[in-house]
Amino acid sequence: MPLRKYKPITAGTRWRIGNAYTEITTNKPEKSLLESTKSTAGRNVQGRRSMRYMGGGHKKMYRLVDFKRDKKDIPAVVASIEYDPHRTAFIALLNYVDGEKRYIIAPQGLKVGQKIISAEKVEIEIGNAAPLGTLPIGANVHNIELTLGRGGQLARSAGSFAIITGRDGEYTIVDVYKRQPHILCR
């Protein structure tokens, strides 16, 4: 991910480093995978202001992201890598061979035109999805399910990942940064 260093015009920008956004494609988002969201503007369900200084901002459309990756053994091609206003990570638009389109969280190093797949036994490449039990010890993983079939819940934000540190019977021991030292997953 290319980084942009800001000019030290003020004290706040002296050591500021941000994303250069050069990896993002200029395609418009897929309309079938968009939903409108209503801004709460700091109001609760009764309409009363419960959070001060909230409101305004740019209108956002929610992108429906596939956290389950349950389309097994069907290859897909990365059509574009896009910005998502609701999360820190970029998202990738996948075009499956059967014609379906889905968004996933884009791991670092994913390129447009790359072929990826979700399967039980799969090559270890960036973007492929597999059960934790089939991956080798020491592999970096992201978008981890805590409960089978519930979808990814761990290591979903930009730059976050977990490391497979061992196995204990049918469980896999995963080390997540800044969390419990080890989390057991199937």
Where are these regions (language model features)?
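SH3/SH3-like beta-barrel fold
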Residues: 92-96, 172-175
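Short, structured beta-strand/loop micro-motifs enriched in basic residues and often containing a Trp
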Residues: 95-102, 120-126
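Beta-strand/loop nucleic-acid-binding surfaces
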Residues: 99-111
